[in-house]
Amino acid sequence: MELIFLGTSAGVPTRSRNVTAILLDLQHPTRAGLWLFDCGEGTQHQLLHTAYHPGKLDKIFITHLHGDHVFGLPGLLCSRSMAGNVNPLTIFGPAGIREFTETALRLSGSWTDYPLEIVEVSEGVVFKDEQYTVTAGALNHPVECYGYRIEEHDKPGALDAAALIADGIKPGPLFQRLKHGDTVTLEDGRIVNGQDYLSAPQPGKKLVIFGDTAPCPAALALARNADVLVHEVTLEAAMEEKANSRGHSSTRQAAQLARDASVGKLLVTHISSRYDAQGCESLLKECRAVFPECELAQDFMQVCV
């Protein structure tokens, strides 16, 4: 999986940062997929500066309905349609996302030429297929807001072809069945269990993307043991009280949560427009003082999960 930050500013865009949007390129060997998390104003403009096309999007996950997270959605949906795309698209989001989307399209005389499904989520599993499970967890913000935990299912172990050949089993169609862990009967009557020739399953990656939140127990539970956590850091530690009063977190609080949840890497975003480049360096230092495995996101930054 690879994350591409399209917008990393809080509330309003700046000259160097657009408002919130994050692409997730699944890069799964058996399943192509491009997911978008939040869609602030100007997201489709940001996409134009990448190698990705809106037509490749198949899922959009909205954390909450504040404008800096959704005002880019109607335009993106329309542009995707005007490009002639007919591939289905599913939008997941809190209560109200259906009304917001349908009202924006209706009042502007717009429509989509592709199947559009809108799913209003609550806590729990919101999507599951053979490769991934996505779970929503409620966060602490003035409006209904969610974080999303994306879990890649464990991948089967690798087949030890050399061991099979050493045991007198020739390469061929049977190898594919053995790779799936099946038990097969050879021409000489031997029974071979594929599980005996497979390495241990490869654990799937765990990625957690938060919407806006002040510290809360649910956030800690959702982030537990994630390989990568994306967390907002709207304000510096000295302004923690102000951040919390508005449903946001400070640098110190985001880093503490990452440490307490035993995550592998912390990516901080949703930076207040009050901070210039030097200020952002200070924010990162505050985070790393508590949790060293931290990076401060920039627009168009790409991170492998």
Swiss-Prot record:
Keywords: Endonuclease, Exonuclease, Hydrolase, Metal-binding, Nuclease, tRNA processing, Zinc. The keyword Coiled coil does not apply. CDD domains: RNaseZ_ZiPD-like_MBL-fold. GO terms for molecular function: 3'-tRNA processing endoribonuclease activity; exonuclease activity; zinc ion binding. Zn(2+) 1 binds at H64, H66, H141, D212. Its cofactor is Zn(2+). Its EC number is 3.1.-.-. InterPro entries: Metallo-B-lactamas (IPR001279), RibonucZ/Hydroxyglut_hydro (IPR036866), RNase_Z/BN (IPR013471). Zn(2+) 2 binds at D68, H69, D212, H270. Binds 2 Zn(2+) ions. The keyword Membrane does not apply. It comes from the Bacteria. The active site is at D68 (proton acceptor). It is an enzyme of class 3 (hydrolase). NCBIfam families: PRK00055.1-1, PRK00055.1-3, RNase_Z. Homodimer. Belongs to the RNase Z family. RNase BN subfamily. Zinc phosphodiesterase, which has both exoribonuclease and endoribonuclease activities. This is Ribonuclease BN. The gene is rbn.
